[in-house]
Protein backbone atom coordinates (compact mmCIF):
# COMPACT_ATOMS: atom_id res chain seq x y z
CA UNK A 1 0.00 0.00 0.00
CA UNK A 2 1.31 3.47 -0.86
CA UNK A 3 2.32 6.05 1.72
CA UNK A 4 0.26 9.21 1.65
CA UNK A 5 1.47 12.80 2.06
CA UNK A 6 0.07 14.98 4.81
CA UNK A 7 -1.54 17.11 2.12
CA UNK A 8 -3.97 14.27 1.36
CA UNK A 9 -5.59 14.60 4.80
CA UNK A 10 -6.13 18.35 4.40
CA UNK A 11 -7.32 17.91 0.84
CA UNK A 12 -9.84 15.29 1.90
CA UNK A 13 -11.27 17.54 4.60
CA UNK A 14 -11.54 20.47 2.22
CA UNK A 15 -13.26 18.51 -0.52
CA UNK A 16 -15.64 16.61 1.72
CA UNK A 17 -16.82 19.75 3.45
CA UNK A 18 -18.82 20.63 0.34
CA UNK A 19 -22.01 18.57 0.57
CA UNK A 20 -23.26 18.92 -2.99
CA UNK A 21 -26.87 18.58 -4.10
CA UNK A 22 -28.44 15.40 -2.85
CA UNK A 23 -31.67 13.95 -1.56
CA UNK A 24 -32.02 12.41 1.88
CA UNK A 25 -33.81 9.06 1.66
CA UNK A 26 -33.09 5.61 3.03
CA UNK A 27 -33.67 3.62 -0.14
CA UNK A 28 -32.12 0.48 -1.59
CA UNK A 29 -29.35 1.22 -4.08
CA UNK A 30 -28.88 4.85 -3.11
CA UNK A 31 -25.30 6.01 -2.55
CA UNK A 32 -23.92 7.87 0.46
CA UNK A 33 -20.52 9.29 1.35
CA UNK A 34 -19.58 7.90 4.78
CA UNK A 35 -16.80 10.45 5.20
CA UNK A 36 -19.17 13.42 5.39
CA UNK A 37 -19.93 12.49 9.01
CA UNK A 38 -17.54 9.64 9.76
CA UNK A 39 -17.53 9.00 13.51
CA UNK A 40 -20.77 10.95 13.88
CA UNK A 41 -23.21 9.12 11.58
CA UNK A 42 -25.75 9.05 14.41
CA UNK A 43 -26.31 12.75 13.74
CA UNK A 44 -27.99 11.97 10.42
CA UNK A 45 -29.16 8.39 11.02
CA UNK A 46 -31.56 7.66 13.87
CA UNK A 47 -29.77 4.74 15.51
CA UNK A 48 -29.25 5.88 19.12
CA UNK A 49 -30.47 8.94 21.06
CA UNK A 50 -28.74 12.23 20.43
CA UNK A 51 -27.57 14.13 23.49
CA UNK A 52 -30.44 16.58 23.24
CA UNK A 53 -33.18 15.25 25.53
CA UNK A 54 -35.84 17.08 23.54
CA UNK A 55 -36.19 15.44 20.12
CA UNK A 56 -39.64 16.33 18.74
CA UNK A 57 -38.82 15.51 15.11
CA UNK A 58 -39.52 11.91 14.10
CA UNK A 59 -36.99 11.69 11.29
CA UNK A 60 -35.18 8.39 10.69
CA UNK A 61 -32.60 9.20 8.02
CA UNK A 62 -31.18 12.59 7.03
CA UNK A 63 -27.93 11.56 5.37
CA UNK A 64 -27.58 12.95 1.81
CA UNK A 65 -28.09 10.21 -0.80
CA UNK A 66 -27.74 9.94 -4.54
CA UNK A 67 -29.15 7.68 -7.24
CA UNK A 68 -26.37 5.84 -9.07
CA UNK A 69 -28.44 3.43 -11.19
CA UNK A 70 -31.52 3.88 -13.31
CA UNK A 71 -34.52 1.55 -12.99
CA UNK A 72 -33.21 -0.27 -9.92
CA UNK A 73 -36.62 -0.65 -8.27
CA UNK A 74 -37.16 -4.03 -9.94
CA UNK A 75 -34.20 -5.48 -8.03
CA UNK A 76 -35.31 -4.16 -4.64
CA UNK A 77 -37.90 -5.61 -2.30
CA UNK A 78 -39.35 -4.52 1.02
CA UNK A 79 -41.93 -5.75 3.49
CA UNK A 80 -43.51 -4.66 6.75
CA UNK A 81 -44.25 -6.79 9.83
CA UNK A 82 -47.82 -5.92 10.81
CA UNK A 83 -49.49 -9.21 11.77
CA UNK A 84 -51.65 -8.40 14.83
CA UNK A 85 -51.45 -10.20 18.15
CA UNK A 86 -47.74 -11.10 18.14
CA UNK A 87 -44.51 -9.30 18.94
CA UNK A 88 -42.47 -8.76 15.76
CA UNK A 89 -38.99 -8.73 17.22
CA UNK A 90 -36.60 -10.34 19.63
CA UNK A 91 -35.10 -10.12 23.09
CA UNK A 92 -31.36 -10.57 23.40
CA UNK A 93 -28.36 -9.76 25.55
CA UNK A 94 -24.70 -9.31 24.70
CA UNK A 95 -21.71 -9.69 27.01
CA UNK A 96 -19.05 -7.02 26.63
CA UNK A 97 -15.63 -7.16 28.28
CA UNK A 98 -15.05 -3.42 27.93
CA UNK A 99 -16.58 -0.25 26.51
CA UNK A 100 -15.25 -0.85 23.00
CA UNK A 101 -17.05 -4.19 22.91
CA UNK A 102 -20.15 -2.41 24.22
CA UNK A 103 -20.05 0.03 21.30
CA UNK A 104 -19.48 -2.85 18.91
CA UNK A 105 -22.39 -4.82 20.39
CA UNK A 106 -24.82 -1.94 19.99
CA UNK A 107 -23.95 -1.67 16.28
CA UNK A 108 -23.70 -5.42 15.70
CA UNK A 109 -26.14 -5.32 12.78
CA UNK A 110 -24.45 -2.44 10.99
CA UNK A 111 -21.90 -3.34 8.33
CA UNK A 112 -19.87 -1.13 5.99
CA UNK A 113 -17.90 -2.99 3.36
CA UNK A 114 -14.10 -2.54 3.54
CA UNK A 115 -14.29 -1.38 7.15
CA UNK A 116 -13.03 -3.76 9.84
CA UNK A 117 -14.73 -1.73 12.58
CA UNK A 118 -17.94 -0.35 11.08
CA UNK A 119 -19.28 0.72 14.47
CA UNK A 120 -16.56 3.38 14.63
CA UNK A 121 -18.31 5.25 11.81
CA UNK A 122 -20.98 5.94 14.46
CA UNK A 123 -18.97 5.96 17.71
CA UNK A 124 -15.54 7.28 16.68
CA UNK A 125 -16.49 10.83 17.64
CA UNK A 126 -17.91 9.93 21.05
CA UNK A 127 -16.31 11.32 24.18
CA UNK A 128 -16.99 9.53 27.50
CA UNK A 129 -19.66 11.94 28.71
CA UNK A 130 -21.85 11.85 25.60
CA UNK A 131 -21.24 8.11 25.10
CA UNK A 132 -22.52 7.49 28.63
CA UNK A 133 -25.59 9.64 28.03
CA UNK A 134 -26.47 7.82 24.82
CA UNK A 135 -26.14 4.47 26.58
CA UNK A 136 -28.09 5.57 29.65
CA UNK A 137 -25.29 5.12 32.21
CA UNK A 138 -23.23 7.42 34.42
CA UNK A 139 -19.96 8.71 32.95
CA UNK A 140 -17.88 7.18 35.77
CA UNK A 141 -18.96 3.71 34.65
CA UNK A 142 -17.79 4.14 31.08
CA UNK A 143 -14.27 5.24 32.05
CA UNK A 144 -13.50 2.76 34.82
CA UNK A 145 -12.46 -0.88 34.81
CA UNK A 146 -15.88 -2.38 34.16
CA UNK A 147 -17.62 -4.93 31.97
CA UNK A 148 -21.15 -4.71 30.59
CA UNK A 149 -24.22 -6.62 29.53
CA UNK A 150 -26.36 -4.97 26.87
CA UNK A 151 -29.99 -6.10 27.07
CA UNK A 152 -32.19 -5.12 24.16
CA UNK A 153 -35.73 -5.69 22.93
CA UNK A 154 -36.10 -4.97 19.22
CA UNK A 155 -39.32 -4.42 17.28
CA UNK A 156 -38.87 -4.82 13.51
CA UNK A 157 -41.14 -2.76 11.26
CA UNK A 158 -39.80 -2.49 7.71
CA UNK A 159 -37.10 -4.41 5.85
CA UNK A 160 -35.65 -3.60 2.45
CA UNK A 161 -32.93 -5.34 0.45
CA UNK A 162 -31.62 -6.07 -3.01
CA UNK A 163 -33.06 -9.42 -4.12
CA UNK A 164 -30.42 -10.05 -6.79
CA UNK A 165 -26.94 -8.98 -7.83
CA UNK A 166 -26.86 -5.74 -9.78
CA UNK A 167 -26.40 -6.68 -13.47
CA UNK A 168 -23.15 -5.64 -15.15
CA UNK A 169 -24.99 -3.56 -17.73
CA UNK A 170 -27.49 -1.93 -15.37
CA UNK A 171 -27.71 1.65 -16.72
CA UNK A 172 -26.02 4.33 -14.63
CA UNK A 173 -27.32 7.81 -14.05
CA UNK A 174 -25.69 10.11 -16.65
CA UNK A 175 -23.89 12.29 -14.09
CA UNK A 176 -22.44 9.18 -12.40
CA UNK A 177 -21.11 7.98 -15.74
CA UNK A 178 -19.60 11.42 -16.29
CA UNK A 179 -17.90 11.39 -12.88
CA UNK A 180 -16.47 7.94 -13.56
CA UNK A 181 -14.95 9.21 -16.80
CA UNK A 182 -13.30 12.05 -14.87
CA UNK A 183 -11.75 9.68 -12.30
CA UNK A 184 -8.03 9.45 -13.10
CA UNK A 185 -5.89 6.55 -11.90
CA UNK A 186 -3.13 7.90 -9.64
CA UNK A 187 -4.87 11.24 -9.10
CA UNK A 188 -5.94 11.55 -5.46
CA UNK A 189 -7.96 14.70 -6.02
CA UNK A 190 -10.13 13.12 -8.71
CA UNK A 191 -10.80 10.05 -6.53
CA UNK A 192 -11.81 12.11 -3.50
CA UNK A 193 -13.94 14.38 -5.68
CA UNK A 194 -15.70 11.28 -7.04
CA UNK A 195 -16.49 10.17 -3.47
CA UNK A 196 -17.80 13.63 -2.65
CA UNK A 197 -19.96 13.89 -5.77
CA UNK A 198 -21.16 10.27 -6.06
CA UNK A 199 -20.44 8.50 -2.77
CA UNK A 200 -18.41 5.73 -1.20
CA UNK A 201 -21.11 3.09 -0.57
CA UNK A 202 -24.66 2.17 -1.50
CA UNK A 203 -27.51 0.82 0.62
CA UNK A 204 -27.70 -2.95 0.15
CA UNK A 205 -30.22 -3.66 2.93
CA UNK A 206 -31.83 -2.04 5.95
CA UNK A 207 -34.30 -2.74 8.72
CA UNK A 208 -36.20 -0.03 10.56
CA UNK A 209 -38.37 -0.11 13.66
CA UNK A 210 -37.41 0.72 17.23
CA UNK A 211 -35.90 -0.84 20.33
CA UNK A 212 -35.60 -0.56 24.08
CA UNK A 213 -32.22 -1.22 25.62
CA UNK A 214 -30.55 -1.17 29.03
CA UNK A 215 -26.88 -1.42 29.96
CA UNK A 216 -25.92 -3.33 33.11
CA UNK A 217 -22.46 -2.52 34.51
CA UNK A 218 -20.44 -5.11 36.44
CA UNK A 219 -17.16 -5.53 38.25
CA UNK A 220 -14.85 -7.91 36.41
CA UNK A 221 -15.43 -10.62 39.01
CA UNK A 222 -19.23 -10.53 38.90
CA UNK A 223 -19.21 -10.22 35.12
CA UNK A 224 -17.17 -13.43 34.77
CA UNK A 225 -19.50 -15.22 37.17
CA UNK A 226 -22.72 -14.30 35.36
CA UNK A 227 -21.21 -14.93 31.92
CA UNK A 228 -20.10 -18.45 32.84
CA UNK A 229 -23.41 -19.25 34.53
CA UNK A 230 -25.51 -18.20 31.54
CA UNK A 231 -23.06 -19.83 29.13
CA UNK A 232 -23.35 -23.18 30.91
CA UNK A 233 -27.10 -23.16 31.60
CA UNK A 234 -28.49 -20.87 28.92
CA UNK A 235 -30.79 -17.96 29.64
CA UNK A 236 -33.88 -20.18 29.76
CA UNK A 237 -32.09 -22.61 32.06
CA UNK A 238 -31.92 -20.10 34.88
CA UNK A 239 -34.69 -19.76 37.41
CA UNK A 240 -36.53 -16.46 37.44
CA UNK A 241 -35.04 -15.73 40.86
CA UNK A 242 -31.48 -16.32 39.63
CA UNK A 243 -32.08 -14.25 36.53
CA UNK A 244 -33.37 -11.26 38.47
CA UNK A 245 -30.61 -11.65 41.04
CA UNK A 246 -27.83 -11.40 38.45
CA UNK A 247 -29.32 -8.22 37.01
CA UNK A 248 -30.22 -6.62 40.34
CA UNK A 249 -28.64 -3.49 41.86
CA UNK A 250 -26.99 -5.55 44.61
CA UNK A 251 -25.11 -7.68 42.05
CA UNK A 252 -24.46 -5.19 39.25
CA UNK A 253 -22.31 -2.14 39.93
CA UNK A 254 -24.80 0.06 38.09
CA UNK A 255 -28.15 -0.31 36.32
CA UNK A 256 -28.49 1.98 33.33
CA UNK A 257 -31.67 3.75 32.35
CA UNK A 258 -33.99 2.08 29.86
CA UNK A 259 -33.73 4.02 26.63
CA UNK A 260 -35.30 3.75 23.21
CA UNK A 261 -33.20 3.94 20.05
CA UNK A 262 -35.31 6.85 18.82
CA UNK A 263 -35.39 8.66 22.19
CA UNK A 264 -39.19 8.27 22.18
CA UNK A 265 -40.26 9.82 25.48
CA UNK A 266 -43.64 8.04 25.45
CA UNK A 267 -42.23 4.53 25.26
CA UNK A 268 -39.51 5.36 27.81
CA UNK A 269 -42.18 6.56 30.27
CA UNK A 270 -44.10 3.34 29.63
CA UNK A 271 -40.97 1.35 30.47
CA UNK A 272 -40.37 3.21 33.73
CA UNK A 273 -43.97 2.56 34.75
CA UNK A 274 -44.50 -1.01 33.55
CA UNK A 275 -41.05 -2.52 34.04
CA UNK A 276 -40.63 -1.83 37.74
CA UNK A 277 -39.53 -4.77 39.82
CA UNK A 278 -39.91 -4.86 43.58
CA UNK A 279 -37.90 -7.12 45.89
CA UNK A 280 -38.83 -6.52 49.52
CA UNK A 281 -38.11 -2.80 49.99
CA UNK A 282 -35.97 -2.40 46.85
CA UNK A 283 -37.59 -1.05 43.69
CA UNK A 284 -35.86 -0.75 40.36
CA UNK A 285 -36.64 -0.75 36.65
CA UNK A 286 -35.36 -3.66 34.57
CA UNK A 287 -35.79 -4.72 30.97
CA UNK A 288 -35.61 -8.33 32.19
CA UNK A 289 -39.26 -8.03 33.13
CA UNK A 290 -40.07 -8.36 29.41
CA UNK A 291 -38.33 -11.72 29.12
CA UNK A 292 -41.02 -14.31 28.42
CA UNK A 293 -43.85 -11.88 29.25
CA UNK A 294 -46.14 -12.07 26.22
CA UNK A 295 -48.65 -9.59 27.68
CA UNK A 296 -46.09 -6.83 28.10
CA UNK A 297 -44.52 -7.61 24.73
CA UNK A 298 -47.87 -7.28 22.97
CA UNK A 299 -48.39 -3.90 24.62
CA UNK A 300 -44.92 -2.83 23.60
CA UNK A 301 -45.45 -3.99 20.01
CA UNK A 302 -47.66 -1.03 19.17
CA UNK A 303 -45.55 1.49 21.10
CA UNK A 304 -42.32 0.78 19.25
CA UNK A 305 -42.96 2.45 15.91
CA UNK A 306 -40.97 2.84 12.72
CA UNK A 307 -38.69 5.46 14.25
CA UNK A 308 -35.10 4.17 14.04
CA UNK A 309 -32.65 2.18 11.93
CA UNK A 310 -31.98 -1.26 13.42
CA UNK A 311 -29.86 -2.82 10.69
CA UNK A 312 -27.91 -1.35 7.80
CA UNK A 313 -25.63 -2.98 5.22
CA UNK A 314 -23.58 -0.62 3.07
CA UNK A 315 -21.62 -2.02 0.13
CA UNK A 316 -18.78 -0.22 -1.64
CA UNK A 317 -19.43 1.13 -5.13
CA UNK A 318 -17.49 -1.79 -6.62
CA UNK A 319 -20.30 -2.86 -9.03
CA UNK A 320 -20.08 0.33 -11.07
CA UNK A 321 -16.39 -0.34 -11.82
CA UNK A 322 -16.75 -3.95 -12.96
CA UNK A 323 -15.80 -3.11 -16.54
CA UNK A 324 -12.88 -0.90 -15.44
CA UNK A 325 -10.83 -2.99 -12.97
CA UNK A 326 -7.88 -0.57 -12.84
CA UNK A 327 -10.13 2.29 -11.78
CA UNK A 328 -11.80 0.00 -9.25
CA UNK A 329 -8.41 -0.85 -7.73
CA UNK A 330 -7.41 2.82 -7.52
CA UNK A 331 -10.75 3.87 -6.08
CA UNK A 332 -10.54 1.21 -3.37
CA UNK A 333 -6.96 2.16 -2.52
CA UNK A 334 -8.03 5.74 -1.86
CA UNK A 335 -11.12 4.54 0.02
CA UNK A 336 -9.09 2.20 2.26
CA UNK A 337 -6.49 4.85 3.08
CA UNK A 338 -9.20 7.38 3.82
CA UNK A 339 -10.82 4.97 6.28
CA UNK A 340 -7.50 4.45 8.09
CA UNK A 341 -6.87 8.19 8.33
CA UNK A 342 -10.31 8.84 9.79
CA UNK A 343 -9.93 5.98 12.28
CA UNK A 344 -6.63 7.42 13.53
CA UNK A 345 -8.04 10.91 14.00
CA UNK A 346 -11.20 10.05 15.92
CA UNK A 347 -11.50 10.73 19.69
CA UNK A 348 -12.00 7.01 20.40
CA UNK A 349 -8.50 6.38 19.02
CA UNK A 350 -6.99 8.42 21.85
CA UNK A 351 -7.33 6.63 25.23
CA UNK A 352 -6.86 9.84 27.23
CA UNK A 353 -10.06 11.34 25.85
UniProtKB/Swiss-Prot annotation:
Predominant location category: secreted
Protein name in the entry: Torso-like protein
Glycosylation sites: 71, 138, 187, 222, 264, 293
Signal peptide: 1-19
Its biological purpose: Probable ligand that binds to the torso receptor. Implicated in a receptor tyrosine kinase signaling pathway that specifies terminal cell fate.
Cellular compartments annotated: Secreted
Tissues/organs with expression: Restricted to specialized categories of follicle cells localized at the poles of the egg chamber.
UniProt-recorded Gene Ontology molecular function terms: signaling receptor activator activity; torso binding
InterPro entries in the cross-refs: MACPF
Keyword Glycoprotein: yes
TM ranges: none
Single GO biological process annotation from the record: embryonic pattern specification
A Gene Ontology term for the protein's cellular component: extracellular space
Entry annotated with the keyword S-adenosyl-L-methionine: no
Keyword tags: Developmental protein, Glycoprotein, Secreted, Signal
Amino acid sequence: MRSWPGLFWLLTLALLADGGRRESQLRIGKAINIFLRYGYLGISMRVIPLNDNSEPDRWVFKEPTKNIYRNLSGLAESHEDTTPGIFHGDFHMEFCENRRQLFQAYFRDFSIERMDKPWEAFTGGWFPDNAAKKLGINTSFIQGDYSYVLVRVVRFRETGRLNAEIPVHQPLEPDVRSRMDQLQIGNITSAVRFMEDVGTHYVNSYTTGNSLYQVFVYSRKNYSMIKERIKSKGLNGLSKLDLYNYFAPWFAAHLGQIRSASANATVERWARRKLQYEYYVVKYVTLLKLHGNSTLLRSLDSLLGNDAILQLDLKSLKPIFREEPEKESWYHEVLDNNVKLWELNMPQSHPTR
